[in-house]
A protein has these predicted regions:
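Extended, Lys/Arg-rich, non-catalytic nucleic-acid recognition/anchoring regions
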Residues: 21
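Intrinsic disorder at enzyme termini
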Residues: 6-7, 136
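Signature of N-terminal electron-transfer/Fe-S-associated modules in redox systems
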Residues: 1-4
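Generic anion/oxyanion-binding catalytic loop in active/binding sites
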Residues: 18, 61, 163
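Catalytic alpha/large subunits of respiratory electron-transfer oxidoreductases
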Residues: 25-26, 31-32, 36-37, 41-43, ...
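Short, conserved phosphate-binding/catalytic loop or strand-edge motifs used
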Residues: 9-16, 46-60, 222-224
Length: 351
């Protein structure tokens, strides 16, 4: 008699369809509910839960729907048994085959700490690195899954346009053509993409200034005062959100523009902080007081008595939506004046 054989019915669970990013192997699930707690408490969406009791219990999504958030990729890292894995990365490489490089995310203004795993010359995946000062242990789905876009439509060699068509060229030939064009040009303009490295941007800056040109660094037409860097850099840090009792959002939608920052604001809100919004009211993952949509609201706030608020740690976050308006410079100046009036309120220009 074989006493070691398990003769009871074995537990089997159907896999879930959580969308194109997260692959599921639910027979591995041990019902630890880490994924449920993350989506509910950190991401702020109630789309996962546990049904049944005992051996019939299983983790599932609400009505079998896919996850609708900018952060659910983090449940891949949280799952202790491999029931939730990255669908784009699955079965493409082994961890010991990868070269691991620490880097900084450039998909939003938060600057999350990440690890880039490469195999040969190909980027295979991005993983979060713990950094309490910025992203804690989370990254957005845009950051986590943008790597596959780095493989396609890449320029592998320089090209020269002749008779309206591009033809491949060598680097010496391309640089020679560029030198001739620059020497014979009366005006020179240079454009730098969002994903260009700092070294390349600095080299272009030296080139333009060497030709007597004017350098202007501005993101998406933001009305930033070039002569007063302190006006837009701000005095607050990301960590200060954890201690803030009042948070003001001006022209910002952090849930879309910086999901990890939004999760940090939600954590402060859950602790008891109040959140105010100036601008279009957006769908956030926490309750917020909509103060108004017009920029003149900031001026009205300056006229109020702030003695009760001055003793509380507060933060003003100015988003890109406010800075790209025609009156973006005035909004930034008004926000800075409000920050100074609410001393010791801190000022954080974001996104």
């Amino acid at each position: 008699v074989d006493f070691s054989r398990f003769r009871e019915p074995k537990r089997a669970v159907d896999d879930l369809d959580l969308g194109p990013l997260v692959e599921t192997h639910m027979t591995r699930c041990i019902s630890c509910t880490r994924c449920v707690r993350f989506t509910t408490e950190v991401a702020g969406i109630a789309q996962m839960g546990q049904t049944g009791r005992g051996e019939d219990s299983e983790i599932t999504s609400y009505l079998g729907e896919t996850l609708d958030s900018n952060l659910p990729g983090n449940i891949i890292d949280l799952c202790p048994v491999g029931a939730l894995v990255s669908k784009p990365y699955a079965f493409t490489a082994r961890p010991w085959e990868l070269t691991k490089t620490e880097s900084v995310d450039v998909m939003d203004a938060l600057g999350s700490s990440i690890r880039v795993d490469t195999k040969g010359r190909e980027v295979m995946r991005f993983l979060p690195l713990n950094h309490d000062g910025t992203n804690e242990e989370w990254i957005s789905d845009k950051t986590r899954f943008v790597w596959d876009g780095l493989r396609r439509q890449r320029l592998d060699k320089p090209y020269i346009r002749e008779n309206g068509k591009l033809r491949p060229a060598t680097w010496p030939e391309a640089l020679g053509k560029a030198t001739e064009a620059i020497k014979g040009a009366s005006t020179l303009a240079g454009l730098v993409g969002d994903l260009a490295p700092v070294e390349a941007a600095y080299a272009l800056k030296d080139l333009v200034e060497g030709q007597g040109g004017i350098v202007e660094c501005r993101t998406d037409g933001a009305k930033l005062p070039a002569g007063n860097r302190a006006a837009y850099v701000g005095t607050a840090t990301i960590e200060d959100i954890d201690d803030a009792e009042a948070i003001m959002l001006i022209g910002s939608n952090p849930r879309v523009e910086a999901p990890v920052l939004n999760a940090r604001i939600r954590k402060a809100w859950a602790r008891g902080a109040s959140v105010g919004v100036i601008g279009e009211m957006v769908d956030l993952t926490y309750e917020a007081n909509h103060i108004g949509t017009d920029a003149t609201v900031i001026g009205d706030l300056l006229k109020r008595d702030h003695s009760a608020v001055q003793e509380k740690p507060s933060i003003i976050i100015v988003g890109q939506g406010a800075l790209t308006r025609g009156d973006g410079a005035a909004i930034l100046a008004a926000a800075q004046a409000l920050a100074e009036d609410l001393d010791p309120v801190e000022f954080l220009e974001d996104l």
